Amino acid sequence: MKNSETLEKFKKNYDLNGTAYIEKDFTPFSDDQFLKISEYCNNVEKEFVEVGDADEPNHVHVGRFMTDIKKPEIVDNLYSNKLIDILWSKNIKSYIQFIVNTNDEIYLRRIQYNQINKDCFVGYHLDIDSNPDYLAACVLQLGKNFDGGLYRVYNKNNKKSFIDYKPDYGSLLISDCQYPHEVTKVTDGERGSLVFFVSKNPDLNKRNN
């Protein structure tokens, strides 16, 4: 793994604040992997979404690689399996396990690309409302030039208290799914990110059971 002292800092931030913000040079992705991910996300077919998976108000274009309605299902397109091969390579999986402080087996449950254009946003929500077994959301920033679009994470016990993260190109956010959050309105440019959710449960989505 990369600089262990720095990774410990990320792990501590995740534990204390519910989110680790990781600069590009410290993510587990190689330059080649990052370029391939960008290509897949750029080319995947997208749909406009106004209501999110946690029933939150949205205004976002979404490209899907894996869905999690009743159970995790890989979307049939040219890119899903290639993307999964990258995301679940051994070093990336172990990196995420380290940050979220678990030795348990973890699984991919949902993977999507979120394209947020000017005046668009992702509303306030809890990821565990989509699936109560979600452990962490991992957000890889692919957008370069945009204003606004802050990743805002709220204190679990006080909605008036929050931390804003301005994600730089190539950065990775790993966020505890028990913390409410939103993406504020993009005021200029286009914000694009790959979002994938991990869980200790590979089976049926308990939201629907």
Walk through the language-model features, giving the residues of each:
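Catalytic core of non-heme Fe(II) oxygenases with the double-stranded beta-helix
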Residues: 93-208
